[in-house]
Amino acid sequence: MATPALRLSVSNNRPRFTSIIESDPKDIIFDMDGTLADITHRRHYVESKPKNWDAFYRAMINDKPVEAVIMVAQLLKTAGHRIIIATGRPRRYNIPTLRFLQDNDISYDAVYLRGDTDYRPDTVVKEQMLHKMRDNGYNPTIAFDDRKSVVEMWRLND
């Protein structure tokens, strides 16, 4: 079944979406930190040395939504696409992650988090997540992520 692809235009500083073409439903990945969630207020915990990852993650309860990206996720879901959350957050932060998604009306089909003791780079962790997604029947074709290295990894594994 084909679903409409979306075009974004901006008028009076407000985004507006319109249907332009029909496309098959897609599996679409969204990152959390820096993509759906504004982490500006807690970035300092990991930009200085030593990095304080515990404080960084504990402060996620104060994250603000990135409204434009959330709107895209909502519209894509409404158009029939499957939304997959792939985050570098450790699994122990599953509850606040799901709460953020719920509080911001982000419907999703699956959530993938890193293991609690997995300290590998995001590119490695998310590549492994991609293999798990495919094992679970997903075939992501689009990804929204704020890190260039992760975006490049998604491209290389297309």
Model-derived regions, located:
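Surface-exposed amphipathic alpha-helices with a cationic face
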Residues: 73-77, 134, 155
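Acidic, divalent-metal-coordinating active-site segment for phosphoryl/phosphodiester hydrolysis
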Residues: 125, 130, 146-157
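Short, high-confidence coil segments that cap the C-terminus of an alpha-helix
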Residues: 81, 138-140
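Conserved SAM-binding loop
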Residues: 143
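Short loop/turn elements that form and flank the Walker-type P-loop nucleotide-binding site
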Residues: 23, 137-138
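Short, structured coil segments at secondary-structure junctions
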Residues: 106-107, 156-158
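Alpha-helical substrate-recognition element adjacent to the catalytic core
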Residues: 4, 10-120
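Donor nucleotide-activated moiety binding/catalytic core segment of transferases
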Residues: 121-137
